[in-house]
Amino acid sequence: MAACSVSQSKTIEWDKSTLVEVHKGGSYARMIRVSGGDILCCFEFWGAALVRRSKDNGKTWAEPIQVAKAPSGSASNPEMLQLANGWVLLFYNERPNDGVHHFTIQVSVSKDKGRTWKHHSLAYEADVNPHNGCWEPSAIQLPSGEIQLFFANEYPYKDSDEQEITLLRSFDNGKTWSEPKAVSFRAGRRDGMPVPCILKDKSIVCAIEDNGFSPMFHVMIVHTTDNWNQPPADGSSPRRWRAIEQPIDVEWGGGPYIRQMPSGETILSFQSSVGREKPQMVVYVGDENARNFVGRSVPFEVPRDKGGWWGSLFVKDDHTITAISSCNGGVWAIDGRIK
């Protein structure tokens, strides 16, 4: 039997005593722990990418620092990655609204653990037309030092509504980037919102949203054991599977996020619309291979006519997973444990 075999009884128990508002207002929040122990939380607020710091393990948060602002429109979808050399990269999606500036994936860097920031590189440039844009960057660093940056990309499909998941590689700590490579594409559909995770067996998975089964999105896992050297995983690829073992047919699986616990379990979150007027964040527990997700739990209490948007997950320690969501008027976080 696998060391981390998941049963129907596994779920997350959320500790309401840990519930904290990180920021009043704001959206698309993500957390990392930097060397030294502080936690950083990045999020979008009034079109800018901001970062707040916690020195007490997420109980309280210092005043926000502005990392990036777009010349037109917004600096959206911020996501952080601490590199092996100690730098912290913040990736964001420049979303213009003037018909002049391009949609881009930009990178900012902090060399002092998130205290000060400067622009680092332009990773990708798409069109000025929002129908041919690029969206939602997220990244990992391999043990070799290679950075892999994933994002949703309409730009290669100017004559259709299709979208792929694109990979860029950097071998110099994010200063320069490779040519784009498609790693996931279902013809005629829209793969979106990728979140990568390096598993304990050194393979890589990417949680994405996929509207290939119905007009609603479902969460899919795309997998590689050869560092994405194969053609993109299409709708029939064995390297691509539905995440939820027993999906609810009417469940909208937007905005996925995935992490792996030190004990091996994979934790998956996404936005669910089941029994609601607007979606909320739900969380499932999977096995060590990012399969067989079960044990649906709801970390935040949100009125059914209000939304819980753009959730994420943070492995706080060996036994604690933190859920973060934009709900109830702000960016909220809560700790949970597998039971």
Where are the model-predicted features located?
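Asp-box/BNR beta-propeller blade signature and adjacent active/binding-site loops
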Residues: C4-K339
